[in-house]
Amino acid sequence: MIANLAKAANVNVQRILRVCIASNTTMNHLLLGVDSDPVRMEPYIPSFFSWDGLRGIDLRLPAHPDAPVILAPNIGSYVGGDITAGTFSSMIWNRDEMSLFIDLGTNGEIVYGNRDFLMSCACSAGPAFEGGDISCGMRATDGAI
């Protein structure tokens, strides 16, 4: 994806000097080649929450070899870097009023709160869109939402 975007923008990948990645906890583990079994087995604790010191060359990314790679930190087993990045970019952590941030995909994550506190939770959302053994649901296609 990086190479395609750089090509479309007519940018030499060697000029990409920083890479930020926001993915769920399991994808973070797979990206770094870390065993992801702890995420899916009791007590559902990730092998890591954050990972510092990555460079483009470490992940064989099409970017400058020394480009720092910032991996959005995991909050928990099913609340990963994707929801961390969404919470940060939506600025709900800095608001006076109570706010709700929802990320729906195969898993659903919800963050609720304001500058005083934030709480999060996760749930399986895929079956609601895929119709897997439930009476009301459909595939993730036009009209699903």
What are these regions (language model features)?
Residues 31-85, 129-133:
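Glycine-rich phosphate-binding loop and adjoining helix at the ATP-binding site
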Residues 1-30, 38-40, 70:
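N-terminal glycine/serine-rich phosphate-binding loop of ATP-dependent small-molecule kinases
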Residues 24-32, 103-110:
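Conserved phosphate/anionic-ligand binding catalytic regions in large, soluble enzymes, centered on
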Residues 38-51, 85, 93-145:
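Glycine-rich phosphate-binding loop of actin/hexokinase-like ATP-binding domains
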Residues 1-11, 17, 66-67, 75-80, ...:
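Alpha/propeptide regions of enzymes that mature by internal proteolysis
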Residues 22, 80, 101-103:
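Alpha-helical architecture
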Residues 2-6, 20-22, 84-88, 108-111, ...:
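Short, well-ordered alpha-helical packing segments
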